[in-house]
């Protein structure tokens, strides 16, 4: 199976909502079982709230800073960023044109350390 970034980008932005007043800049590109693949291409501000599953962001284009639980993690293309289920996080200081895949998986509340 192939999932196209170009095809999914063409569907963005989705209409604005109360939570995302500048429009919704993520779309589910694929789902299988508990795993979902989201294309995230924010514009303006990032209004995310904690998620119920663990997530892995893979940066395709652009740079910025992930703020996770108050700590800053600068990122650039090719980087992968992990956020545990329930953690406060958002993206800041990101370049116009930021694009990343976000992979959500596992049970509600996230995986436990082995």
Tell me what each language-model feature is.
Residues 37-39, 66-68, 100:
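Short hydrophobic/aromatic-rich beta-strand segments that constitute the beta-sheet cores
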Residues 27-29, 46-51, 68, 92-93, ...:
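Short histidine-centered beta-strand/loop micro-motifs
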């Amino acid at each position: 199976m192939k999932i196209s970034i170009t095809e999914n980008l063409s569907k963005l932005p989705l209409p604005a909502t109360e939570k995302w007043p500048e429009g919704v800049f993520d779309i589910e590109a694929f789902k299988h079982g508990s795993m979902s693949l989201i294309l995230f291409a924010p514009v303006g501000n990032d209004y995310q709230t904690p998620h119920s599953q663990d997530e892995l962001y893979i940066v395709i284009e652009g740079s910025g800073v992930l703020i996770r639980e108050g700590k800053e993690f600068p990122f650039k293309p090719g980087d992968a960023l992990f956020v545990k289920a329930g953690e406060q996080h958002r993206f800041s200081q990101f370049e116009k044109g930021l694009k990343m895949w976000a992979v959500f998986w596992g049970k509600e509340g996230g995986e436990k350390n082995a």
